[in-house]
Amino acid sequence: MIPPDTQTELPFLAGVDDEGEPIFESLSVTAVDEEQGLVRLLRSPLFARNLASGDRIKVINAATAEYRLEERSGNLSIRVFSKEDIDPLAETLTPALEKIDGALDLRHERALVYSIHYSIGFQEIEDTLNDALKDYPYAVWYYGNVYDPEDGTTPIGWWLDIDEQ
């Protein structure tokens, strides 16, 4: 296992290729509890679904990318994809999300990933995203951990469980 407070990269399933072979995304984690095999995600993923920065995960088998989500951090994962260079959009969107406590986790030439706590409010987050993207018709945003990974449309509702605590 990974010693506590140690940072490392672990493979997470990101999808499958045209031949049905798995594709993995390497994600940064820090060990939380070596004995129980618990790690915490340091950044929201670009492709791996149903996860966000700060989520606590139990490592079942790192070699085969088997994990179990133990506890959600309350962060939403927001993925922005662009058909063109992302820099102009990033210069607009990043400060707008930072104003409502969002954080840029990943910047790629055609994608951005942000984390923001759900308590900010879905409407405020979505309004901020839509306002920033209105001048960039070649870009689109998605939540990475709000919808069922199987159908991509059914809200999971994990934030309701946190609200009840």
Language-model segments: which ranges?
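Extended boundary segments
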Residues: 1-21
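Short beta-strand-centered aromatic/proline hotspots
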Residues: 23-31, 44, 64
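Short, structured beta-strand/loop micro-motifs enriched in basic residues and often containing a Trp
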Residues: 33-43
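Short, charged beta-turn/beta-strand-edge "cap" motif at the junction between a beta-strand
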Residues: 45-47, 60-67
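Short glycine-/aliphatic-rich beta-strand segments at the starts of folded cytosolic domains
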Residues: 70-84, 112
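Helix-rich terminal scaffold detector
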Residues: 86-165
